[in-house]
């Protein structure tokens, strides 16, 4: 099955051998997204809400570059560093999915960047029914 690599304009260099998104048969897989600037520095250190907003804006950019919208997101994998940030993450998350919510799971774990508080990976169905 052919696949299309999705790299939005202005995307920084990844931390490992991956791309921001891959589109195959109308399904977009968005890589785990950390709150990083173009030089791979963590932004908004200590602020889980602001980091979540940055991550979701980055994901939104990948989805839009593939021709979709956040309404096309059907599943999110959320990784958080500390359960104490769960409420702040959810408050911001809810603003990006005001209607029907995508399925998701959330786990607490260590993240590749020590000052990152959240990482999200997504799946979206673009151009075809989910």
From Swiss-Prot:
GO terms for cellular component: cytosol. GO terms for biological process: nitrogen utilization; uracil catabolic process. GO terms for molecular function: deaminase activity. It holds the Pfam family Ribonuc_L-PSP. Keywords: Hydrolase. Its EC number is 3.5.-.-. It comes from the Bacteria. Signal peptide: none annotated. The keyword DNA damage does not apply. InterPro entries: RutC, RutC-like_sf, YjgF/YER057c/UK114. It catalyses: (Z)-3-aminoacrylate + H2O + H(+) = 3-oxopropanoate + NH4(+). Belongs to the RutC family. Involved in pyrimidine catabolism. Catalyzes the deamination of 3-aminoacrylate to malonic semialdehyde, a reaction that can also occur spontaneously. RutC may facilitate the reaction and modulate the metabolic fitness, rather than catalyzing essential functions. This is 3-aminoacrylate deaminase RutC. It comes from Methylorubrum extorquens (strain PA1) (Methylobacterium extorquens).
């Amino acid at each position: 099955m052919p696949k299309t690599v999705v790299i939005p304009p202005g995307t920084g260099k990844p931390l490992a051998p991956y791309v921001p998104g891959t589109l195959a048969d109308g399904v977009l897989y968005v890589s785990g997204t950390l709150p990083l600037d173009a030089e791979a520095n963590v932004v908004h250190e200590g602020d889980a809400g602001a980091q979540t907003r940055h991550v979701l804006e980055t994901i939104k950019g990948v989805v839009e570059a593939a021709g979709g919208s956040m309404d096309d997101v059907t599943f999110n994998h959320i990784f958080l560093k500390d359960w104490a940030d769960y409420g702040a993450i959810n408050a911001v998350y809810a603003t990006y999915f005001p209607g029907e919510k995508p399925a998701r799971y959330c786990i607490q774990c260590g993240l590749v960047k020590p000052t990152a508080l959240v990482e999200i990976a997504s799946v979206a169905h673009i151009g075809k029914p989910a």
